[in-house]
Amino acid sequence: GSNVKGGHVSIEQAKIYAEWLAARYHDKPNIVWLNGGDIHGSDTVDVWNAIGYTFMQKDSGHLVTFHPRGRTQSSWWYHEKPWLDFNMFQSGHRNYDQDDTELSYGEDNWRYAETDYDLVPVKPTLDGEPSYEHIPQGLHDTLQPYWNDNDVRRYAYWSVFAGSCGFTYGHNSVMQFYRPGDRKGSFGVRKFWFDGIHDPGAGQMKHLKKLMLSCPYFERIPDQSLIANQGK
């Protein structure tokens, strides 16, 4: 989203690019369009709307959402837009002490899901960028502890039980495909991607999926009252 925010993409250019993408991939079965790009939806609203409406008109067979900045959610800006098929929030990579936003949800990603679930019109929601496995807490300070499989499991179950339609798993090494010979990786990467894919968090996501699909998917209703002492 930085190119758009920097004023390097006009509304007309955005439409042309979205039309090209839609034409190229409209017959592919595994496409979900992520409008935005790790950015506040309040930045260059007209461009994001142009892209969203173009996808809706030119490729109605694929879902469209918006990838927001850390500790924000797409519903703040686009929930009522017809091009937004489902909401996405980014709980981000900060721990409780590092979150300096007004909401101060910190690691409580379930709060974003709970908020979206109660909106009208009803739309699905999920955490599109929670803390990734094996990435430093807060991203940039490599002296901080690294998020592990216990953390990603916690985020996954918390958000799904609060009403999310699914979950996004990420791994620091795999995200950047870090490999031998790369001069310098990002975010304190310590593993190669082909080792990272075998870390425990990735393999454990299947258990949540199995649980979600063990009952009729569209009949799931979150009930936070079942949780005693917030899981402590």
What name fits each language-model region?
Residues 3, 76, 137, 178-179:
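Short Asp/Glu-rich motifs
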Residues 75, 84-103, 107-150:
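Active-site clefts of carbohydrate-active enzymes
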Residues 31-35, 63-66, 85-89, 124-132, ...:
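Structural recognition of the beta-strand scaffold that forms the well-ordered cores
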Residues 121-125, 133-136, 152-232:
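Aromatic- and carboxylate-lined catalytic core of secreted/periplasmic carbohydrate-active enzymes
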Residues 1-98, 108:
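Active-site mouth of glycoside hydrolases
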Residues 22, 52, 113-117, 156:
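Short amphipathic alpha-helical segments and helix-helix/interface helices
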Residues 6, 10, 14, 44, ...:
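Residue-level preference for long, well-ordered alpha-helices that form the structural scaffold
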Residues 24-29, 57-59, 115-123, 162-164:
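A structural motif corresponding to the C-terminal end of an alpha-helix
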